[in-house]
Amino acid sequence: MTLIQTFHGTASNGTPLTAVYAEQPAAAAAFALVFPGSDLPRFVHWGRPLTAPETVINTFDALAPQRVSGALDYTAWPSVLPTQSEAWSGSDRFDVRRDGVELFCKFQVTAIEAETVAAGKTYTMAEKDGYPSWSVASEPKQTPTVTVTAEDVEQCVKLTWTCELDETGLIRQHAEVTNTGEGRLEIGKIELAFTVPADANEILTTTGHHLRERSPQRQDFTIGRFAKSSMIGRPDFDATLLLSVGEHGFGFTHGNVYSAHVAWSGNSVLSAERLPYTTGVIGGGEVLFGGEVGLEHGESYTTPWLVGSYGEGLNEVASRFHGYIRRVHRDWLVDHGIAPKPRPVILNTWEAVYFNHDYDTLTALADKAVESGVERFVVDDGWFGARRDDTAGLGDWQISQDVWPDGDKSLKALADYVHGKGLEFGLWFEPEMVNPDSDMFRNHPDWVLKPTAGRLPMQGRTQQVVDLTNPDAYDYIYGAMDKLVGELGIDYIKWDHNKLVTEEVSPLTGRPAAHAQTLAVYRIFTDLKAAHPGLEIESCSSGGGRIDLGILSIADRVWASDCVDPVERADIQRYTSLLVPPEMIGEHVGASPAHSTHRATSQEMRMATAFFGHMGIEWNLLKEPQEDIDKLAEWTAEFKKHREWFAVDTVVHSDAADPAVRVDGCVMPNKAAAIYRFTQLTTSQTYPAAPVKLPGLDPDAVYEVSPLDVSLDLAKQDIGNGQSPLGWWTADGVKMTGRALATYGIRPPAIHPAQAVLFKVVRV
């Protein structure tokens, strides 16, 4: 049962104490806060439920640091918003100014509300006709919530801090700052924090660039500050999805791990910081440019949610994010009366034809798509204005008469043809961008973000950024998209964003506009989806340049990378799934050699890699032999058998000792069955490859492990040096307990590098 309790006591030094304990038993998660006197709260526990919650009141005496020589009279024990007034000597985490002068605030708590908020929906899942089925439960969602009101009366700044323990076990905190005085209050940065244990001594983040997103990097969590920030209007490739700390060597299946994420699609920072005097903190927030957000008397600014996830290993950390995102989307469907549906198999035309659109080619491609089992046909860039290449036309969201003339070979005719084949129709847009060589820019040069009236920011891909904070520009973009969605019967929008947003100043106000621009993007997403119930939108940003809980709450999927080379995708997919559930990660079967790397790979490898995401095709099937089309159809048919379970499954990754291999899986919620993928990226040091562990199963159950029933002919994939048959690679498989599979595992087949095989695990 969901629990929140408040306790009162007195510290050994006479300080009055208040403690709040919150628990979500079903999620095996809890947190505890202690308020020393009227100070802001400290996290004193974040992890598994406690057996004696009333003892959290004692944590002040148990954990508060002593005063030490050569320092202040009080040794810092960081609150949720560390400031110098509480002896924090680290980086500035609360940057506000009045009349250009920085304020050093000391907040005094005036009210603490700790309650279970009964709001939102809860769901029950049952199996119907072999697939998961959801229904809305009668009881509302129960969320333990702490709301703290605090104020610096002299400085005329009020703080309202809210913390929730979600049913998934995620902890969400945000702060609202209100100007209670005269004169404009400028907001620079409000970086909230979670305290972490002393043995959380290693940091894991991701970095990357175009075509190589979310590459993991580790380092010791030493004294000092480590930060990953993005100041180009989106999270971008180098920003980290999560900042995770844990016991040295933590992995997907082991180690206490504490992760933080800023749920925001604009400028932000995630950081880990440790001082010589006190415990470490992780946290983050939005970063604002000078003059960007200013509050007049009575006005407020609210930070994005800072979200924390605890787990025994990264798999559990990720599962909490997946559960949260899935519920948000389930709520949207229920609230708007939209029936849920399986993730349709997509064909996107980009790597098939690029800008070379014509009716005959794309209708023929649609025919091949139908043969391959495709259910959604998406026309990519090149259908509008003067958009014959990437140097012109962006912003002119009218159908090009040069490419799609009115008549029986128009874009409307193509949409009708696609719909007539039983497919959904999708179309590419890049609403936030404009080419200087466009009618929109020529007619409205003031509709772009730029630092001065006479100078544009540096171009990227021959593009500038539309000022969506300008109501006229917003109305034009929204109106053009709304009109086309209605006229063409568009079921799906691929929304792209291909320029780093720099020198982001609105001509309308003369002030930086990153914050307002991000809110405008959220608004146009929700406006379009509300106006066209059932419309789905994919978030793409030069591939995976904008992936965060902000955009994930309103987009229906993300494009993980412009690189569909399956060798590169193996880790891109793996680390994207730390935040994003598989059914929301666009994974496409591309050509061989891959367009982005020129690496040749087998069709089996490409299909097996795409199998664990929102499966699609980005490949000119008109040039492929019928044998390949038939094989593709077999794989899409197999994917359709499992995709509804993938959308509720627990995603697991194994910590393979061999750096040359990857083991990934999707386990049913009741652990009755699972599908795993073994990928041999390069040659292994051992020959054959060592046994691999299969995490996530019921340790006490017996399972049958066998190959998945698709074209995984080892005779075509083996190394060919006379190896013997693999004992369990038969239709009958082998029976083992879940504990055995997780402890010492199973021997994978000997296959060439850049190959992958799938196998199923079924409880008997």
Whereabouts are the PLM-identified features?
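Aromatic-lined carbohydrate-binding/catalytic grooves of carbohydrate-active enzymes
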Residues: I338-G479, Y492, E503
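Active-site neighborhood of glycoside hydrolase catalytic domains
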Residues: K409-S410, R442-E604, H614-W619, K623, ...
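Short Pro-Gly-centered flexible turn/kink motifs
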Residues: F107-V109, G120, V293-E312, A754-K760
